[in-house]
């Protein structure tokens, strides 16, 4: 059972989505929930159906005291690596909140630097901390929508299906069609495709 840090009124949860994909930004969200307006059914976004995620995302946006998205683009990921880019995007999400939290709970085992707010990393936080679950849902919905937009631009890559993850289909398309400007050049399968073309 997770124990919340004592003596802090406004607690934000932060999570990222999109460390593994070969394309696009890593997207993060920060959420401060309203203790007087609870949301039923919050869970790790990966364990929810798309329909449930979308419904919960709307409810979170409506009921949360504050929420914000952050991101780090593919070229930033290539420049500073995916871990540093994820942490940078988390800081951006927290700094974009319209209400600044007193404490931040971060999914995983690392705390972003430059937060300037007391923080704690929570391993598997997206499953055990409501604020982090809410953040994971908002980040996942936002990133999936971006992949659906990219799919409209480049339907031959089937981004709506694999969401940019290195599935067999995506790797086949990469080998056949080459990399797009949105692909992460520092990731091995993309590097390989760039060498072939």
UniProtKB/Swiss-Prot annotation:
Q: Which GO terms describe its molecular function?
A: manganese ion binding; RNA binding; RNA-DNA hybrid ribonuclease activity
Q: Does the keyword Protein biosynthesis apply?
A: no
Gene3D superfamilies linked: Ribonuclease H-like superfamily/Ribonuclease H (3.30.420.10)
**Superkingdom of source:** Bacteria
The coiled-coil regions, if any, are none
Q: Does the keyword Nuclease apply?
A: yes
Gene Ontology BP terms: DNA replication, removal of RNA primer; mismatch repair
Q: InterPro entries recorded for this chain?
A: RNase_HII (IPR022898), RNase_HII/HIII (IPR001352), RNase_HII/HIII_dom (IPR024567), RNaseH-like_sf (IPR012337), RNaseH_sf (IPR036397)
What reactions does this protein catalyze?
Endonucleolytic cleavage to 5'-phosphomonoester
Query: Matching Pfam families, A to Z?
Result: RNase_HII (PF01351)
Enzyme nomenclature, EC number? 3.1.26.4
Binding-site residues for a divalent metal cation, renumbered to this chain: 15-16, 107
Q: How is the cofactor bound?
A: Manganese or magnesium. Binds 1 divalent metal ion per monomer in the absence of substrate. May bind a second metal ion after substrate binding.
What role does it play? Endonuclease that specifically degrades the RNA of RNA-DNA hybrids.
Which family is annotated?
Belongs to the RNase HII family.
Spell out the protein name for this chain.
Ribonuclease HII
Organism from which the protein derives: Haemophilus influenzae (strain PittEE)
Which lineage ranks, top first, belong to the organism behind this chain?
Bacteria, Pseudomonadati, Pseudomonadota, Gammaproteobacteria, Pasteurellales
